């Protein structure tokens, strides 16, 4: 089974544009605020963005998918250290003709970004520079956490993008690298770890008011990933 590969990147506090949205949960006797983390998934068409969101949010692989038109999102409520958090995963179109009218909308108030490429298609890997440029060009703060995901690693005989090349790219852009397969049920835990690591990091950040006060005092610190002996990325929870 392919494992998360640790680069030299770090996940850092999101910008003051909004650590998380809030909603009220009335399922309990009293209303409780639930934080919502918006994570967008970006990359070429047919790299498996939709399948990754299905695998994480629903635990399944769709029998049939169609090209995403504009943007779609799925949600999953998770519990981290006793707190319910709603992870909202935005699945974005990879084709230019479907993106133009929606691009500003799905970059707005984003908390984390997942860049996806197909390990069996070198062009999807080389196009990552274009996607990173688009992300940077839409006012996504540089401190918003970003990770790189190589999908379809179950197709071992067709792999065109070697892990060492992808890791070098991830390091150069201060990102963590994960290699996985949305299709292979054995990789479902690996897919979940991508989004859960981001959710854990976002949750670990202090409240906006307290963090902004620290920023004014110059005390905001990076949140670093630790490296375990087996090379896996270690989450804070």
UniProtKB/Swiss-Prot annotation:
Which InterPro entries does the annotation name? Answer: P-loop_NTPase, Rab33A/B, Small_GTP-bd, Small_GTPase
Residues that bind GTP? 46-51, 65, 68, 94, 151-152, 154, 182-183
| Annotated motif Switch 1, positions | 59-71
Give the Cysteine methyl ester positions (modified residues).
237
Is this entry keyworded Lipoprotein?
Answer: yes
Location comes to: Cell membrane
Enumerate the Pfam families for this protein. Answer: Ras
Cellular component per GO, a single term: plasma membrane
Under catalytic activity, the entry for this protein gives: GTP + H2O = GDP + phosphate + H(+)
Q: Where does Mg(2+) bind?
A: 50, 68, 91
Domains (record comment): Switch 1, switch 2 and the interswitch regions are characteristic of Rab GTPases and mediate the interactions with Rab downstream effectors. The switch regions undergo conformational changes upon nucleotide binding which drive interaction with specific sets of effector proteins, with most effectors only binding to GTP-bound Rab.
Family label: Belongs to the small GTPase superfamily. Rab family.
**Protein's recorded name:** Ras-related protein Rab-33A
Q: Which organism is it from?
A: Mus musculus
GN (gene name): Rab33a
């Amino acid at each position: 089974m392919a494992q998360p590969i640790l680069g030299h990147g770090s996940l850092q506090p999101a910008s003051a544009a909004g650590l998380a949205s809030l909603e009220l949960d009335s399922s309990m006797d009293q209303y409780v605020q639930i934080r919502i983390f918006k994570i967008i998934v970006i990359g070429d068409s047919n790299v498996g963005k939709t399948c990754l969101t299905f695998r994480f949010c629903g635990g399944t692989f769709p029998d049939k998918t169609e090209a995403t038109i504009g943007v779609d999102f799925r949600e999953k409520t998770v519990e981290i250290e006793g707190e319910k958090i709603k992870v909202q995963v935005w699945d974005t179109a990879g084709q230019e003709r479907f993106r133009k009218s929606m691009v500003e909308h799905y970059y707005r108030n984003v908390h984390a970004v997942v860049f996806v490429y197909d390990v069996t298609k070198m062009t999807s890997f080389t196009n990552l520079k274009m996607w990173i440029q688009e992300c940077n060009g839409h006012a996504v703060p540089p401190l918003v956490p970003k990770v790189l995901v190589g999908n379809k690693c179950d197709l071992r005989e067709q792999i065109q993008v070697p892990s060492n090349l992808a890791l070098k790219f991830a390091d150069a852009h201060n990102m963590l690298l994960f290699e996985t397969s949305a299709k292979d049920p054995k990789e479902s835990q690996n897919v979940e770890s991508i989004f859960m690591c981001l959710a854990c990091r976002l949750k670990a950040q202090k409240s906006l008011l307290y963090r902004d006060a620290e920023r004014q005092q110059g005390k905001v610190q990076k949140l670093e990933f630790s490296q375990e002996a087996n090379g896996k990325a270690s989450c804070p929870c």
